[in-house]
Structures are given as structure tokens and as C-alpha cells.
């Protein structure tokens, strides 16, 4: 049976990833306990990469059983685990808040972001017409945990933002062509890691630049409907 074959093949990949994760976790510990923090760090990055790959595999595993509602149940679990906030600010700007820093560009990183952001956007706009911002600025605000100041020096060019822009474009942009939307990137300290994305009309961008310096630690209130 094709479904069973795909299911078991995917399960085998999950088991292989978990085995490699166990090996990397042991290596992370060994190098740390033996005073080689640099190599422990390198191994921890590899462990994180394997973990992301395992997550992508386990997310599709329930659907391969053929069970009715598997995708919806998986989306619900993702929503509970990664509660993405979507809405409009009081000024009428569209915003998305992701409770994590975006990963670096790597194999599987776009799929990982798509798996939680697209369902959140789809749910928010269900029964609502798309909102099209023209001549706007797409601002990415990377909020890092202030207890981890080394994250302030993130290389914005190496962060996986393209898939976020693509998903936002489906609902709030005519497209992401430079003539329609400019991009702006900044970092700020906060109580915990998160990523804030704002879609702002260009004539409002100077106002946003001023407000950005004093945004609340947990982010501004977001509304279901656009008031402006």
C-alpha cells in the first residue's frame, strides 16, 4: 500500500535523524566537558540543524497515515507550539509577530518557516478579503533576548526572510517587487527572542522609525480589522 510505504519510509528518516541527533548531543557534551567550547558550539549548530530537519519530517508523518483531519490537527499543534500573532496596529499597519528569531538561510529553513507562518496567515484572513499595501516598506525587527547580547550582531543578509516576504505577499502585497515594497532590517533588545514584521505605507515610515525606539517589550496591540 503506497500510504504505508511512504509512512514507513518517512518514519525511517525520522529515526535516522534522531540517531544522528543523539550522536551530536553526546559530542556537544564531550567537547564542552573537555574544554573545547568552540567545537562544542559547532556541534550544537549541527544538532540544531538536525533537529529542524526532524521536525519537518515528523510534521508530515501523521498525514501519511491517511487519517481524516491529520493536517488540521497538525496545524493546531503547530499553532499552539509556535503562536504567531497576526493583525493590524492602531495606525493601520499590518504586522506579524513570530515568537522566535528567524533562522539562517539553510536547507529546510524556508520549509520550516512556511509550516507555521502560512497556516497562521490563512487562518487570520479566512473569510476576510486580502489587504493590498502599495508603495510600502516591509520592516523586519529582530528582537533578541537581552541576556544574549551576541545575537544583536546578526547578519541580516543571511537570515531567511524571503519565504516570509513571499507568504505576506499572498495576502497584503500586490507582489514583493522593489517598486512596490522596500525592505528595512533592524535589531532590538527584549525580554525574549521574537521577530516582528511590519508592512507600512512609505509615507508612514518616518513615524514608524520614531515609534520603533519605544515599542513595548511584548509588542503593540494587534487588531483583527484595519481601522485606517
Walk through the language-model features, giving the residues of each.
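Short glycine/proline-enriched loop/turn "hinge" motifs that connect secondary-structure elements
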Residues: 86-90, 129-134, 189
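Amphipathic alpha-helical interaction surfaces
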Residues: 60-63, 127, 167-171
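C-terminal edge-of-domain segments
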Residues: 177-225
Amino acid at each position: 500500500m503506497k500510504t504505508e510505504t511512504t509512512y514507513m519510509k518517512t518514519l525511517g528518516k525520522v529515526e535516522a535523524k534522531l540517531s544522528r541527533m543523539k550522536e551530536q548531543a553526546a559530542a556537544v557534551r564531550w567537547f564542552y566537558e573537555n574544554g573545547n567550547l568552540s567545537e562544542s558550539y559547532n556541534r550544537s549548530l549541527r544538532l540544531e540543524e538536525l533537529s529542524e530537519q526532524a521536525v519537518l519530517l515528523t510534521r508530515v508523518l501523521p498525514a501519511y497515515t491517511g487519517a481524516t483531519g491529520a493536517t488540521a490537527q497538525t496545524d493546531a499543534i503547530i499553532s499552539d507550539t509556535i503562536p504567531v500573532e497576526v493583525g493590524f496596529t492602531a495606525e493601520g499597519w499590518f504586522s506579524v509577530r513570530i515568537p522566535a528569531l528567524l533562522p539562517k538561510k539553510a536547507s529546510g529553513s524556508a520549509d520550516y518557516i512556511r509550516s507555521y507562518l502560512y497556516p497562521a496567515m490563512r487562518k487570520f484572513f479566512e473569510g476576510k478579503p486580502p489587504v493590498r499595501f502599495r508603495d510600502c516598506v516591509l520592516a523586519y525587527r529582530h528582537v533578541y533576548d537581552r541576556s544574549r547580547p551576541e545575537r544583536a550582531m546578526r547578519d541580516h543578509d543571511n537570515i531567511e526572510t524571503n519565504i516570509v516576504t513571499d507568504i505576506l505577499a499572498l495576502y497584503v502585497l500586490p507582489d514583493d517587487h522593489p517598486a512596490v515594497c522596500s525592505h528595512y532590517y533592524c535589531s532590538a533588545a527584549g525580554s525574549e527572542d521574537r521577530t516582528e514584521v511590519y508592512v507600512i505605507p512609505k509615507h508612514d515610515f518616518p513615524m514608524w522609525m520614531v515609534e520603533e525606539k519605544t515599542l513595548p517589550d511584548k509588542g503593540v496591540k494587534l487588531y483583527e480589522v484595519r481601522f485606517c
